[in-house]
Amino acid sequence: MNHKLKPTVGLGYCLLCAALCLLLLRDVAIAGSGEEPSGVREARSVGTQVAVQPVDCVQSEWSSWTRCDVCRKKRYRYAKLVQPSQFGGEPCHVQGKEVEPCSPPSRYDCTHDETPLCEGFLCTYTGRCVPIDLRCNGDDDCGDWSAEKGSPKVPKACKQEAQEYHGIENLAKGINILHSHLEGSVIDNRYYAGSCLPHYIQDVRFRKPYNLQQYTLETKGTYDFKLQSFESYSEFVHYTMTERSSKTTVSIGFALPGVAEFGFNYADSKYSKSEKKIRRASRKENSFVQAKAELQLARYILKSEDLMLHPEFFLRLRALPQSYNYGEYRQIYRDYGTHYITEATLGGDYEYTVILDKEKLEKTGYSLEAYKNCEQIVLKVGANIKGVYVTVGLEGGGCDGLLNEMGEDTVKGSMVEDYVAVVSGGDSESITWLAAKNLPTPPLMRLWGEAVHYNLDFIRSVTRPLYELVTARDFSSANSLKKNLRRALAEYLEESSSCRCAPCRNNGLAVLKGTRCECVCPSGYSGLGCEITQRPDIGIDGSWSCWGSWSPCRGRSKTRSRQCNNPAPSSGGIACRGLQMETTDCF
């Protein structure tokens, strides 16, 4: 079915974080027969001979050199990734870009590009236009201190000292939606436009940056856990994807290639460890009980217009050529990310999942719902409550019998196959305690909550593409610059998508890191392609291929499609989720 894209896409389709880790599970079955070519790696998989063929990295020819960057005094050329290396294949030994020093013509300088008329003070180096009354006020309103030069005596900007909002610098950074990394600063959250109006939060004086519409502290959430139970792996994946999609939205203007690959930070060990355990549990005989606790401590909202850009980002945009060159525009996204954060809820959350052996649970005579209810009681009273009589409507008068079966710490009983914890916010010590193979106690939860106040993480956020920061106020050629940035974003996301990797075996997840693909294997599986195991066969979940080429423009729109064959679902695995065909506006 053909769907018209909406301007805002849920993070389930853009930033799936841990949910996508549970969903896009890949398979490559390369059966060995006859003579094996050189470089093929052999392995055993439940008595079946399999082979993984190395794939070498291939890059395109070099582009021509760009013009000399007048600000950086460098010029660039690039090569695009044609085929990433995988399964031990030969890597690419170049980074896909080359930079060399150059001398721009003397008639050009870093602020030469045409700028809109400034009716205030035009900053010497950054080219920023600020109100004339900001001169000699003690603030670095220009980003280069030029508005303070020549002042007889530089006073303090404000008579009273004020604190800076927690996490304000991270909120000024761009974010790369391919892997959720924060990159260089794109807006200037230390620009105040001369304002010294105090903003008091719990008797603490803060100074509000110009770009902010709202920054409030709010204590929402408790140390109580919300529990959900799932009879099967597919139910668990569907719920997790839907629940996480409500937490973050990413506006992109067009759909993303390999949409479900986005948002998961594969370099983060806490996610990769949980990923391996969950994928191992994709067999039909597993059930799941998941618990979550969330603390919301602050809310951040940007102004909707007239944002003050960070001076370095501002100069980089000014130095881009008006004629489109993918190499230079791609470098912007590598250095500053693809999006900026317009709204965010900050705090911390703790999520754990108990993976149960369904057959052993059924043999105890208790239901999955009974297990969930008893686990809720364990959490409310604070861990080892074996022998404590609590009525929860179970036949037999309480949880005593089931707690004996569950084990003293609930997650160590014979019916528990594994336990997965992912904690965000707080400090490393509290996170280490919480992620241990024990249910969290109320004292540990309080300790973690106190640490979250000093190390906030993103709980929910809304982002917009970087090109929306380009306005006619700052750029005389805003329309063409925005058009080029939007075009480059589409190319960059397509070039960098993990859908370009060959599928891994046994629900391993193929991840594109630079120019090479790696397989994140479920627990109990190993090898370059997750091909080595003594475990029985499991259902293989489907994953999307890359998007095909766009159709010719018809009117003002064009379409493209993709297939659920990378790999196709088999043996009862989950089908691909999301659109098979999409429509977007023509550039």
Swiss-Prot record:
Topology versus the membrane: Multi-pass membrane protein
Propeptide: 32-44
GO biological process: complement activation, alternative pathway; complement activation, classical pathway; killing of cells of another organism
InterPro entries (UniProt xref): C8A_B_C6_EGF-like, LDL_receptor-like_sf, LDrepeatLR_classA_rpt, MAC_perforin, MACPF, MACPF_CS, TSP1_rpt, TSP1_rpt_sf
Glycan attachment points: W62, W65, W547, W550
TSP type-1 domain location: 56-111, 541-587
Binding residues for Ca(2+): L134, N137, D139, D141, E148
Keywords from the UniProt entry: Calcium, Complement alternate pathway, Complement pathway, Cytolysis, Disulfide bond, EGF-like domain, Glycoprotein, Immunity, Innate immunity, Membrane, Membrane attack complex, Metal-binding, Repeat, Secreted, Signal, Target cell membrane, Target membrane, Transmembrane, Transmembrane beta strand
Stretches that traverse the bilayer: 248-255, 258-265, 375-382, 388-395
Residue ranges annotated for the MACPF domain, each copy included: 154-500
GO cellular component, one term: membrane attack complex
Domain EGF-like, first and last residues per copy: 501-531
LDL-receptor class A domain: residues covered: 117-159
Compartments, record wording: Secreted; Target cell membrane
Domain of life: Eukaryota
Free-text function comment from the UniProt entry: Component of the membrane attack complex (MAC), a multiprotein complex activated by the complement cascade, which inserts into a target cell membrane and forms a pore, leading to target cell membrane rupture and cell lysis. The MAC is initiated by proteolytic cleavage of C5 into complement C5b in response to the classical, alternative, lectin and GZMK complement pathways. The complement pathways consist in a cascade of proteins that leads to phagocytosis and breakdown of pathogens and signaling that strengthens the adaptive immune system.
Complex formation: Heterotrimer of 3 chains: alpha (C8A), beta (C8B) and gamma (C8G); the alpha and gamma chains are disulfide bonded. Component of the membrane attack complex (MAC), composed of complement C5b, C6, C7, C8A, C8B, C8G and multiple copies of the pore-forming subunit C9.
Alphabetical list of PANTHER family matching this protein: COMPLEMENT COMPONENT C6, COMPLEMENT COMPONENT C8 BETA CHAIN
Family: Belongs to the complement C6/C7/C8/C9 family.
Protein name in UniProt: Complement component C8 beta chain
Species whose genome carries this gene: Oncorhynchus mykiss (Rainbow trout)
Taxonomy of the source species: Eukaryota, Metazoa, Chordata, Craniata, Vertebrata
Encoding gene, per UniProt annotation: c8b
